Amino acid sequence: MTQYRFMAGVTIKIFAAFHVFNEAVASSQPCAGWSMYPTLDATGDAVLLLPMAYWRPKIWGMSNKRPERGDLVVTTNMNNPAYTVCKRVIGIEGDVVEIEPTRSVDGSKSWAQGRFLRVPKGHIWIVGDNLSNSTDSRDYGPVPIAMVKGKVTHRIWHRGWLDWTTLGPNMSYLGPSPVPPPGSVQPRPL
């Protein structure tokens, strides 16, 4: 009987260690949909998620690290908290972001004036790389940093094959970023 108790204890400890590793150190995360195309495939890629990428214990002499512009992050879905979304950070606290662009992403069309917003403290502004087919901060506003599940560093599964593509801060898919001249527009809340 003690042998079964010992084996049950070891099994529980192994599952607990795996769970802690999966929740705090590294895990795979499926990402499907057109929002992050062409960076991630619409049929579904798996990415490496690092939950501890933005956390450092104070004993190391470092404060909590914040998401930076260009980072790919997984956050809780603002429209349905039971799900997560994978998006790119384009604005951090204090940045002024354009909500309604004054020109198309490829720069071919322009409009009179865009809407701008200053990202509040403790928040980030996230968008999908496929701007024309993404529900993101343009729809639900700034995302609290507390809702960030972790940083995406690599694609590990692509079209049915193992893959190890590094996903860095490449924002070239987002097109040109118009910056308003100083004093021309005042940021206003949503």
Feature-to-residue mapping (PLM):
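Protein maturation boundaries and topogenic segments
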Residues: 1-84, 104, 146-147, 151-190
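Mid-length scaffold segments of soluble, non-membrane domains
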Residues: 82-99
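A structural signal for short, hydrophobic beta-strand segments that form beta-sheets
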Residues: 89, 116, 151-152
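A short, structured loop/turn motif at beta-sheet edges
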Residues: 92-95, 118-123, 144-145
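PP2C/PPM family metal-dependent serine/threonine protein phosphatase catalytic domain
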Residues: 100-110
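Acidic loop->beta-strand submotif enriched in PP2C/PPM serine/threonine phosphatases
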Residues: 109-120
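Phosphate/adenylate-binding glycine loop and adjacent helical scaffold
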Residues: 128
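Segments surrounding the PLD/"HKD" phosphodiesterase catalytic module and close analogs
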Residues: 137-147
